[in-house]
Regions:
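Pre-Walker A (Motif I) flank of P-loop NTPase domains
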Residues: 1-2
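Hydrophobic anchor at the beta1->P-loop junction of P-loop NTPases
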Residues: 5
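The conserved Walker
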Residues: 9
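Conserved lysine of the Walker
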Residues: 13
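Conserved substrate/cofactor phosphate-moiety recognition/catalytic segment
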Residues: 18-62
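Glycine-rich phosphate-binding loop used to anchor ATP phosphates in small-molecule kinases
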Residues: 51-105, 114
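A glycine- and Lys/Arg-enriched "phosphate-lid" helix/loop adjacent to the NTP-binding pocket
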Residues: 87-161
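C-terminal accessory "lid"/substrate-recognition subdomains
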Residues: 148-156, 168-178
Length: 178
C-alpha cells in the first residue's frame, strides 16, 4: 500500500513513518521533500518563504508519481498547499487540479496528524508556532474540503489520539481497506 502522512511541523510525522515501516513488512519510507532538497544543496530561508514551499510541493508531486509500491511518504502535496495557504496564497493558483489529482490518486491512504492538546503536551515545542498553527488549520480545511476535487475517493485517517499507538491505528485502518 501507498500511504501519505501529512501534518504541520512538530506533530510526529517522521516518527510515525518510521514506526509504520517497522510494523509493515516490505514498506519503505520516502523522506520529506525538505530533506531531499537539502541534500541537493537547496538553501531554505529562515523563516521559510512561499518559494521554499513551492519547491517542496514540486518534489512532493514528483515523488507521488513514482511507481514504487509499499511506501510511506513523509508529507504529501497537501502539506505544502496548506503552508502556501498560510502564507496567503490560493491553492488554485499553486497547482493544476489534474496534476494534484494524478499525484494524490496514487495513494491508498492519507493519514493526517492535526495539532491536539495531547500532542502539544507530549511532543517537544516546535519552531515558528504561528506558522505551525496557521498551517494546521489550513491543512484540515484543504484535506476535508478537497477544493480542487483531487482526492474524492481517497480514504483519510485523522489521528487525534496520543502519539503512542498511532502506527497500530493506521495498520488497523489499512487492514480494513484491503
Amino acid at each position: 500500500m501507498r500511504i501519505g502522512v501529512s501534518g504541520t511541523h512538530g506533530t510526529g510525522k517522521t516518527t510515525l513513518v518510521e514506526e509504520l515501516c517497522s510494523l509493515l513488512p516490505g514498506h519503505a519510507a520516502v523522506d520529506e521533500p525538505y530533506l531531499l532538497l537539502e541534500d541537493e544543496g537547496h538553501e531554505f530561508h529562515q523563516p521559510p518563504t512561499s518559494e521554499d514551499f513551492r519547491a517542496q510541493l514540486r518534489v512532493s508531486l514528483r515523488l507521488l508519481r513514482s511507481p514504487a509500491a509499499d511506501v510511506v511518504f513523509d508529507r504529501t502535496p497537501v502539506d505544502f498547499l496548506a503552508y502556501l495557504a498560510a502564507h496567503g496564497r490560493t491553492i488554485e493558483a499553486e497547482v493544476a487540479p489534474e496534476v494534484l489529482e494524478s499525484a494524490m490518486s496514487s495513494l491508498d491512504l492519507l493519514v493526517v496528524l492535526p495539532l491536539t492538546a495531547e500532542t502539544e503536551r507530549q511532543l517537544p515545542a516546535a519552531e515558528l508556532p504561528g506558522l505551525r498553527t496557521a498551517m494546521d488549520g489550513r491543512l484540515l480545511d484543504i484535506v476535508h474540503g478537497d477544493p480542487l476535487d483531487a482526492w474524492p475517493d481517497l480514504p483519510v485517517l485523522e489521528l487525534t489520539g496520543p502519539p503512542d499507538g498511532r502506527a497500530a491505528v493506521v495498520a488497523r485502518a489499512m487492514a480494513g481497506l484491503r
